[in-house]
Amino acid sequence: MRFGVDEAGKGPVLGSMFAAAVRADPAALPGGVGDSKDIRPERRERLAKEIRESADAVGIAEISVERIDADETDMNTLTVEGQAEALSAVARDGLSGTVDAGDTDAARFGRRVADAVDTDVAVTAEHGADETDSLVGAASIIAKVARDTHVAELAAEYGDVGSGYPSDPTTRTFLADYVDRHGELPACARRSWSTCDDVLAAASQSTLSDF
């Protein structure tokens, strides 16, 4: 029995980031588990259901927009916290496993995650672990499905918000239109992102040009 941990939604300008941990016998996992970004959404959902059924335990942690925008933190620290919170939900003394490294220094990232978990676990951090470790790949799928569900909930509240990523024209249009109508950013926006600064600056310039 081992564990794998990964996160989804680190880079978007909209919504929460999610981390997931899966404790299981790798041999019990369904076939086709890998990096969630390479799997179509419908198949991700089916695999997530099968992973939950075959795993010994699954843990999920949500890192909210409010935590992301807090002055005293950064995304590396929040990724450590999210992975540690998800891992804490499935960890047992003496357990070992792999986490996807969210820092350029993989060893340092692994130490930080291990230090943030109360249970005595052995953590190995690797870059691209979601592509090489089936348990990390399984955690990647669970985290991505949680993030997809979250984005669908935002769309139900606000209308089409796109993927939530700064590079998505639909997301940028949503932000610009929302600010134009309401004079402020939506509550789901990560206000500390430069994308939000750009949208607010463009709205301010547009207002000035009206005079």
From Swiss-Prot:
GO terms for molecular function: manganese ion binding; RNA binding; RNA-DNA hybrid ribonuclease activity. It catalyses: Endonucleolytic cleavage to 5'-phosphomonoester. The keyword Metal-binding applies. GO terms for biological process: DNA replication, removal of RNA primer; mismatch repair. The keyword Transit peptide does not apply. GO terms for cellular component: cytoplasm; ribonuclease H2 complex. It comes from the Archaea. It is an enzyme of class 3 (hydrolase). Keywords: Cytoplasm, Endonuclease, Hydrolase, Manganese, Metal-binding, Nuclease. A divalent metal cation binds at residues 6-7, 100. Manganese or magnesium. Binds 1 divalent metal ion per monomer in the absence of substrate. May bind a second metal ion after substrate binding. It is found in: Cytoplasm. Residues 1-205 form the RNase H type-2 domain. Its cofactor is Mn(2+); Mg(2+). SUPFAM superfamilies: Ribonuclease H-like (SSF53098). Its EC number is 3.1.26.4. Belongs to the RNase HII family. Endonuclease that specifically degrades the RNA of RNA-DNA hybrids. This is Ribonuclease HII. The lineage of its organism: Archaea, Methanobacteriati, Methanobacteriota, Stenosarchaea group, Halobacteria. The gene is rnhB.
